């Protein structure tokens, strides 16, 4: 679900940036020009990797949660009806809870059954729905939702779509313009191999800024600029973070998204098969259905998950126990009681 181990080039780039780069858009001397070039290279490479024609529509954020908050508050107004895929993280559900009188609909379909999911989604996507929010890959189960088909349905019904690509960016193809999504949010520190505190928001058009402030552009104007990326990027950039993220994206381009996914999928199959041989262990696996990424959940009957995680941690095995900040996913997957 995250990448603790980074390419060495990421740390080196961050160290260089901390000592050699200034703030982009805040001058014309070499250090700020170099920061501007780093920003541009990062946006341009991200745009190529994720199907965005104009790099200006790649917005830097502090994390996927930041980007999802922008997306939600840009599209969801008080009293709106929102259709959720059922696997949303609190980064989606809590912003929705902060908006008055929002009506939520949730797709309920069995785990790892994309065809049934699509049938239920289509049934619930009635004319009353104002926005659809779809998690591309569940951070709890690794379930790969059929986002291409979801996007096609949203285009036909002319309903704006927000995609949470937190677990899929860098792991599966993300094609923002092909999908026609209004927003696609992703963190830098997971499949993009960048540092914590970085993220990207891919925007079809503008959005509503969460914070206002200096951008280095239109400084006489009291309002935020109406063009991207400045409209959504108030304040000083995380320049070392962007430099590290750029190197993470370069690593991803060199290795190839498909090749990294195949490696992760092989490891997941191996882990699932091994765990399934152990007594009292229930594994939540897609088997051979091909709709699971590099995230695997399991439970040990009669044992508290926190105790299991502690025991494994003492043996050098890193796992996470609990709700994973996604109680809705547990409710949809039928694992709330575990």
Predicted stretch roles:
Residues 1-338:
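Pyridoxal 5′-phosphate
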């Amino acid at each position: 679900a995250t990448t603790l181990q980074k390419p060495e080039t990421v740390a080196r780039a961050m160290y260089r940036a901390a000592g050699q780069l200034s703030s982009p858009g805040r001058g014309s001397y070499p250090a700020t020009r170099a920061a501007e070039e780093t920003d541009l290279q990062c946006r341009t490479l991200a745009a190529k990797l994720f199907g965005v024609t104009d790099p200006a529509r790649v917005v830097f954020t502090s994390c996927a949660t930041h980007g999802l908050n922008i997306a939600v508050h840009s599209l969801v107004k008080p009293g709106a009806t929102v259709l959720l895929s059922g696997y949303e993280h609190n980064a989606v559900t809590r912003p929705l809870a902060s908006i008055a009188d929002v009506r939520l609909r949730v797709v309920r379909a069995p785990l790892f059954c994309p065809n049934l999911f699509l049938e239920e989604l289509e049934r619930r996507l009635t004319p009353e729905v104002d926005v659809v929010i779809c998690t591309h890959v569940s951070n709890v189960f690794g379930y790969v939702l059929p986002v291409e088909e979801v996007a096609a349905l949203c285009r036909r019904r002319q309903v704006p779509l927000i995609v949470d690509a937190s677990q899929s960016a860098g792991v599966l193809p993300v094609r923002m313009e092909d999908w026609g999504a209004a927003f696609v949010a992703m963190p830098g520190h997971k499949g993009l191999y960048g540092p914590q505190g970085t993220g990207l928001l891919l925007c079809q058009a503008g959005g509503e800024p969460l914070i206002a402030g200096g951008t280095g552009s239109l400084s006489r104007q009291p309002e935020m600029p109406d063009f991207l990326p400045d409209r959504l990027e108030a304040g000083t950039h995380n320049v070392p973070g962007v430099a590290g993220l750029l190197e993470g994206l370069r690593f991803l381009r060199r290795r190839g998204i498909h090749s990294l996914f195949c490696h992760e999928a092989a490891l997941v199959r191996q882990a699932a098969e091994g765990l399934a041989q152990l007594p009292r262990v229930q594994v939540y696996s897609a088997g051979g259905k091909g709709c699971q990424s590099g995230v695997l959940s399991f439970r040990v009957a009669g044992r508290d998950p926190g105790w299991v995680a502690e025991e494994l941690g003492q043996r050098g095995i890193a796992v996470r126990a609990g709700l994973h900040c996604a109680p809705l996913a547990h409710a949809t997957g039928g694992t709330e009681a575990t």
